Regions:
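Glycine-rich flexible loops
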Residues: 2-150
Length: 150
């Protein structure tokens, strides 16, 4: 007979959580690494490259944030080509030009100290839907936040 048959549910849960903690440890990543991974995830999700949007993450120093270089697609971003910029989009670390459209990210970070990352994209299918000028039919639970707002 199994040893676990005599254990309580709370002990089994505790053991399972302990095993998961040991086996599924999430590696620590730098902000540029997280930003690059997020860009890749967005690209894999159909968010195209080029001028299809911007992503930024708050820097450690007040008034700074990390962003991708202008001209590189989400699929081309690596932790080594991410830029650290100030509120005037002056590059403090890295080489390249940030997207001038990132300027509004500075305003958001200044007004909302609780915000640590901004993702602004133009997915192809959403752009196509917006050109139809037809209100969305809220017919799925995932769209409920849009009820009477689209």
């Amino acid at each position: 007979m199994s040893d676990t048959m005599s254990l309580s549910k709370s002990v089994l849960i505790e053991q399972a959580q302990s095993q998961m903690q040991a086996l599924f440890e999430i590696p620590e990543r730098s902000v540029p690494e997280k930003l690059a991974l997020t860009c890749r995830i967005l690209f894999d999700g159909g968010h195209d490259s080029g001028l299809a949007g911007q992503i930024t993450a708050r820097g450690e120093q007040e008034g700074t944030y990390f962003t991708q270089q202008l001209g590189l697609g989400f699929d081309e971003i690596t932790s080594t080509n991410v830029l650290l910029v100030d509120e005037d989009l002056t590059v403090l670390k890295g080489y390249g030009m940030p997207n001038p459209a990132n300027r509004f990210h500075s305003w958001v970070y200044r007004a909302r100290p609780d915000v640590n990352c901004i993702i602004h994209t133009h997915p192809l299918h959403v752009a196509a839907l917006s050109m139809l000028e037809v209100p969305l039919n809220v017919s799925h639970m995932d769209n409920c936040p849009l009820y009477e707002d689209c």
